Regions:
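Cofactor-binding beta-sheet edge motifs in enzyme active sites
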Residues: 1-296, 300-303, 310-600
Length: 600
């Protein structure tokens, strides 16, 4: 295959590429029309602040860079031709149903002739949400044309050269704050670099617009978002999906306003955190925060991390003769985060599942999510075990297949456990309801007639309130139900309730809830070489009733390190023709074990 690929000759006509965001904006090279989210009279507030001695106004431009997903496993697909023109595709994809649709479109066949299966991926981070589709389609086309199994795998160079990255953003902003530290108005235009064609850029930009407030209440806001067309690879989803870019802009603006007013940025942040309710507890798109977690987390972390005393220690160290002589400086900062959980495209917030109870008491669970190392399968195993009342060892998670659970949404938007877990719980509830009357019959005796509503499934055994000393095994109930022709297979469906968003008005309730947290980061920088080391990190994150604390801690730590890499060392470089120069580990550097904070 590689020898054949080398024989292909491509003819093209060179053009002057548009690569810089600012230049592309100036050239009016856009993929989309502007989106808007508005609250209050921004122009009035900015004008009033400009004319007042009691306020400060800042304006400027802020950029965020690209980032490569760098999964351990590159894009890979195996297509197998089956009878009657059907195709089975094993794909490293976060979105099997979309991959199924693209393969069917390329082959010119209906969806029911294509099955996509994903057992697991070697990393995704959003890079396999939509961009896995092309390689699956190429493999499927090869299988359809030759009648033979076709395998497509990108080597690292091709993967990094040909696939999209985290969207670079350019923000142009004006903001006003009273000299008392109270935020007044924020006018910001967010431009995302979508590359040469439109992938998920419109939705990425939309989420950035919803997160450019981060954790802070602005009485007046005007947010413009637009996708810019450049002659680069088509940029795609990446962990956070525009949220980190919006948050970065928010924190830059807070820092600039605080310094312009001569105030402590830490105090400004604390003063403007969202409240639980009322106007100060409502986002610029109209969703109420609903609780006071941000302020609680802030106060708790400030205390547990000894932030204020450590900040004094940092200032003293920087003033020491040793630090001055060595040209080294330390810094410490505390920042919050508020991240909305749900797809902002409302209809995607749905999931299905199929749960089968076998006659030996073991359970098979099918769902539409995909495992990419984030711990989805173990969490959903725990959900199923708890819902069915069986040991974790009785649960078997099956590979994700579009012919078993169809019409799925991508495993993205931090929604995989919520959506698929809800569907699994619904299926398990149906099965318990079917099995309870059977169990009640088995548990009845000694003149006591057990009813179905008093049956309890727990840890692989079944009991009843009215006969506390009597138990039967879950396997016995399953075998008896099968003999009595009770269905031991059930689908489940879940859709996130009470969410909506109107793009025309820029208002709605797009998120089921917010994940909130805060971090204190202490760093040391060599003022001569620029070398940086993270000395200590304290993170406090509200995980709710955590299903698996170890998995959640791993996600928090991994997310921090990946974000640290994005803002400190990972730099995607394109040449003057738009070719990716950082196409291998030799030229693109991600955090190593030595870069992990010394003290977590």
């Amino acid at each position: 295959a590689r020898r054949a690929a080398a024989l292909v000759e491509v003819a093209w006509e060179p053009v002057m590429p548009l690569l810089d965001l600012a230049e592309a904006i100036e050239a009016e090279s856009f993929h989309t029309e502007p989106q808007w989210i508005r609250r209050g009279d921004v122009e009035h507030e900015l004008a009033a602040a400009t004319a007042s001695l009691d306020a400060v106004v800042v304006e400027g431009t802020f950029r965020t860079g690209a980032q490569d997903h760098f999964p351990l496993e590159t894009h890979v697909s195996l297509a197998l031709p089956e009878s009657d023109g059907r195709i089975l595709v094993h794909s490293s994809t976060q979105h099997p149903s979309e991959t199924q649709a693209v393969v069917a479109h390329v082959l010119g066949i209906s969806l029911n002739q294509v099955v996509v299966q994903c057992a697991r991926m070697g990393g995704g981070f959003g890079g396999k949400e939509s961009q896995a589709n092309a390689w699956a389609a190429i493999a499927a086309l090869g299988a359809a044309k030759t009648g033979r199994a076709t395998f497509v795998r990108l080597d690292r160079d091709r993967h990094m050269t040909m696939t999209g990255k985290r969207h670079p953003f350019l923000a142009r902003y004006r903001a006003a704050m009273g000299r008392d530290g109270q935020l007044r108005a924020f006018d910001v235009a967010l431009y995302s670099d979508g590359g040469w064609s439109l992938d998920l850029s419109d939705a990425v930009t939309g989420r950035a617009m919803m997160h450019v407030d981060n954790a802070y209440f602005w009485p007046a806001m005007r947010v413009r978002g637009q996708v810019v067309r450049t002659d680069k690879v088509s940029q795609t989803a990446f962990r956070g999906f525009g949220g980190p870019q919006g948050v970065a802009v928010a924190e830059e603006v807070i820092d600039r306003l605080a310094r312009a007013a001569g105030l402590d940025p830490h105090v400004v942040r604390a003063r403007n955190l969202y409240a639980a309710a009322g106007e100060a507890g409502t986002t610029h798109y109209g969703e109420e925060i609903g609780d006071d977690r941000l302020r609680t987390i802030w106060t708790d972390l400030e205390r547990s991390s000894s932030f204020l005393s450590r900040r004094d220690d940092v200032a003293a160290w920087n003033a020491s003769s040793d630090a001055v002589r060595r040209r080294r400086r330390r810094g410490i900062a505390m920042t919050p985060v508020k991240f909305g959980i749900s797809f902002t495209t409302t209809f995607l917030n749905q999931a299905g599942a199929l749960v089968n109870v076998l006659v030996d008491g073991s359970v098979q669970v099918h769902h539409g999510g995909t495992e990419m190392g984030q711990g989805l399968q173990i969490k959903l195993s725990q959900v199923a075990a708890d819902a069915m009342g069986v040991p974790l060892t009785s649960i078997r998670m099956m590979a994700t297949r579009t012919d078993v659970v169809p019409n799925t949404s991508a495993t993205a938007a931090s929604s995989g456990t919520d959506l698929n877990g809800g569907a699994i719980m619904a299926a398990c509830a149906t099965l318990r309801a079917r099995m309870a009357p059977v169990a009640a019959t088995l548990l009845s005796g000694d003149g006591v007639e057990v009813t179905a509503d008093e049956v309890h499934f727990e840890a692989g055994s079944v009991s009843a309130t009215s006969r506390p000393g009597v138990r039967v095994s879950f396997a016995d109930v399953a075998r008896t139900a099968h003999r009595e022709r009770v269905s031991l297979s059930s689908t489940g469906f879940y859709r996130t309730p009470h969410i909506w968003f109107d793009r025309e008005t820029g208002k709605g309730r797009p998120f089921a809830y917010y994940a909130c947290g805060a971090a204190v980061t202490e760093v040391e920088v060599d003022g001569f070489t620029g070398e940086m080391h993270v000395r200590r990190v304290d993170i406090l994150h509200d995980a709710g009733a955590s299903i698996n604390p170890l998995v959640d801690i791993g996600q928090v730590e991994g997310g921090f390190v990946q974000g640290m890499g994005w803002v400190t060392m990972e730099e995607v470089v394109w040449d003057a023709a738009g070719r990716t120069l950082t196409h291998a580990p030799s030229t693109y550097k991600i955090p190593a074990a030595t870069d992990v904070p010394s003290d977590w």
